[in-house]
């Protein structure tokens, strides 16, 4: 991915995707074209500050899986290794989970293909079509790609819970309705 495209995704993720998920609009953002996205809440390995990372994902056998397109250089990936227990804001709810890397080659192949298919147009940014590439070619392409399994441990804080932002739009709509009805 070119530096320009990477920067565009960074801006889109930071100023649109993360706020929309924190406001509770995650269920309205997923589509086959745009991809299915979750927001990972990590703890900064140096700062200790909560960081948010929108990621494409797949659910398989009760676990949530993600891949690190930036390989091992992504900050969120490094943060996970410092603190592998995270909260994940999925469109249907929030989970508290523990991360582990997938090492089994068959599982890596199956999961990577599904995550890339679930990524919509972004799934093609690896330089191939995840729907049509052969298993052998895909295994070669993903040799250095971290595949991460998140095993759910419990429920996390969602947009409507403490620390979420859903209260903001609910309050705004309430105020607007009161103003309109008072006229």
PLM region descriptions:
Residues 40-41, 84-94:
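Short conserved beta-strand and strand-loop elements enriched in small hydrophobics
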Residues 33-36, 80-84, 144:
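A short, compositionally biased
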Residues 1-10, 93-177:
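Charged, gly/pro-rich active-site loop segments
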Residues 62-87:
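A short mixed-secondary-structure module that forms the rim of ligand-binding clefts
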Residues 1-30:
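Extreme N-terminal tail/first-helix region
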Residues 177-183:
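Juxtamembrane boundary at the C-terminal end of a transmembrane helix
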Residues 35-70:
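Short beta-strand segments
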Residues 20-46, 168-176:
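N-terminal first-folded block
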